[in-house]
């Protein structure tokens, strides 16, 4: 019987630097001999990418936004994540359900209980084996975004939105200390990757 793969997620506010490290993490796992599926949310499937485009660019109600996030996630789980884990592959995903609790729950102030209903309806048992939360002072995150591409609908939000989002992320980390590890991504890239590599090796050696 094929051993189940491992599910890794990367989280953080826009500008925290998580996407910078996602491809590196996947390559590090491949160097350890693991087969890796690198993916992202919202997205990861043709339908998911279409929904991503809508969510990031079109004006909509908060309920619609949240439901579209979970619609994309349901397709992603069914078509990509669950089959990969069943094959014994490792999945590295740029954002997952923690992002919904942070952005819609914290940033947009939707009640966490409403998000929990959708999470329980979908796949309550499937949680990441490890989540790295890339945390950075918001001034630095916004400075990084200023040098990036044309900002999307979320990246154009006011500072208070990101303060609430960051606070919600840190609350998630406090509530799930066994799964979520905080990474101070204001440090140099070499220091961040040294931490990630050490923790990744420990995870890879776990039975």
From Swiss-Prot:
Transmembrane segments: none annotated. The gene is tmk. InterPro entries: P-loop_NTPase (IPR027417), Thymidylate_kin-like_dom (IPR039430), Thymidylate_kinase (IPR018094). Keywords: ATP-binding, Kinase, Nucleotide biosynthesis, Nucleotide-binding, Transferase. GO terms for biological process: dTDP biosynthetic process; dTTP biosynthetic process; dUDP biosynthetic process. It comes from Bordetella petrii (strain ATCC BAA-461 / DSM 12804 / CCUG 43448). The keyword Kinase applies. This is Thymidylate kinase. Coiled coil: none annotated. ATP binds at residues 12-19.
């Amino acid at each position: 019987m094929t051993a189940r793969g491992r599910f890794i997620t990367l989280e953080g506010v826009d500008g925290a630097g998580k996407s910078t490290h996602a491809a590196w993490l996947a390559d590090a796992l491949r160097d350890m001999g693991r087969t890796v599926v690198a993916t992202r949310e919202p997205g990861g499937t043709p339908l998911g990418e279409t929904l991503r485009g809508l969510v990031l660019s079109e004006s909509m109600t908060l309920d619609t936004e949240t439901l579209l996030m979970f619609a994309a996630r349901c397709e992603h789980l069914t078509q990509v994540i669950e089959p990969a884990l069943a094959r014994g592959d490792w999945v590295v995903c740029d954002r997952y359900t923690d992002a919904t609790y942070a952005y819609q729950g914290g940033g947009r102030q939707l009640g966490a209980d409403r998000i929990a209903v959708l999470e329980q309806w979908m796949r309550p048992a499937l949680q990441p084996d490890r989540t790295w939360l890339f945390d950075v002072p918001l001034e630095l995150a916004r400075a990084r975004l200023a040098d990036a591409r044309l900002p999307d609908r979320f990246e154009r939000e006011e500072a208070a939105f990101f303060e609430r989002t960051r606070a919600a992320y840190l609350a998630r980390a406090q509530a799930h200390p066994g799964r979520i590890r905080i990474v101070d991504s204001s440090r140099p890239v070499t220091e961040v990757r040294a931490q990630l590599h050490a923790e990744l090796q420990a995870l890879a050696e776990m039975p």
